[in-house]
From Swiss-Prot:
<keyword id="KW-0820">tRNA-binding</keyword>
<dbReference type="GO" id="GO:0015935">
    <property type="term" value="C:small ribosomal subunit"/>
</dbReference>
<comment type="function">
    <text>With S4 and S5 plays an important role in translational accuracy.</text>
</comment>
<keyword id="KW-0694">RNA-binding</keyword>
<dbReference type="GO" id="GO:0003735">
    <property type="term" value="F:structural constituent of ribosome"/>
</dbReference>
<keyword id="KW-0699">rRNA-binding</keyword>
<comment type="function">
    <text>Interacts with and stabilizes bases of the 16S rRNA that are involved in tRNA selection in the A site and with the mRNA backbone. Located at the interface of the 30S and 50S subunits, it traverses the body of the 30S subunit contacting proteins on the other side and probably holding the rRNA structure together. The combined cluster of proteins S8, S12 and S17 appears to hold together the shoulder and platform of the 30S subunit.</text>
</comment>
<keyword id="KW-0689">Ribosomal protein</keyword>
<comment type="similarity">
    <text>Belongs to the universal ribosomal protein uS12 family.</text>
</comment>
<protein>
    <recommendedName>
        <fullName>Small ribosomal subunit protein uS12</fullName>
    </recommendedName>
</protein>
<keyword id="KW-0687">Ribonucleoprotein</keyword>
<comment type="subunit">
    <text>Part of the 30S ribosomal subunit. Contacts proteins S8 and S17. May interact with IF1 in the 30S initiation complex.</text>
</comment>
<dbReference type="Pfam" id="PF00164">
    <property type="entry name" value="Ribosom_S12_S23"/>
</dbReference>
<feature type="compositionally biased region" description="Basic and acidic residues">
    <location>
        <begin position="10"/>
        <end position="21"/>
    </location>
</feature>
<keyword id="KW-0488">Methylation</keyword>
<feature type="modified residue" description="3-methylthioaspartic acid">
    <location>
        <position position="89"/>
    </location>
</feature>
<dbReference type="InterPro" id="IPR012340">
    <property type="entry name" value="NA-bd_OB-fold"/>
</dbReference>
Amino acid sequence: MPTINQLIRKPREAQKARDKAPALQASPQKRGVCTRVYTTTPKKPNSALRKVAKVRLTNSYEVIGYIPGEGHNLQEHSVVMIRGGRVKDLPGVRYHILRGVLDTQGVKNRKQRRSKYGAKRPK
């Protein structure tokens, strides 16, 4: 515990807020190329094979992005768009890949929340 005199000499420094998605560099989205597409397992109470991709961004950052929705067409060298947003049960996954943008196809047979999955309106 500092004395009042010590605080007068050197006041307390406010803690800087940490950026949750540093690779975006204050952009809403960034484009990148998939370097590896694979599945991984979530943290403890959950169990699944979550689809993720390692993406090399245009600013030469390399990040892991989650592929949402059922089924996807991504492979190595696919050009994708990422947005911020972590996946709570996948450590190290701090970005989402946008569906229906660039090389990523939208989710087939999606009826609700279509805009989140790049699905067109069914006829």
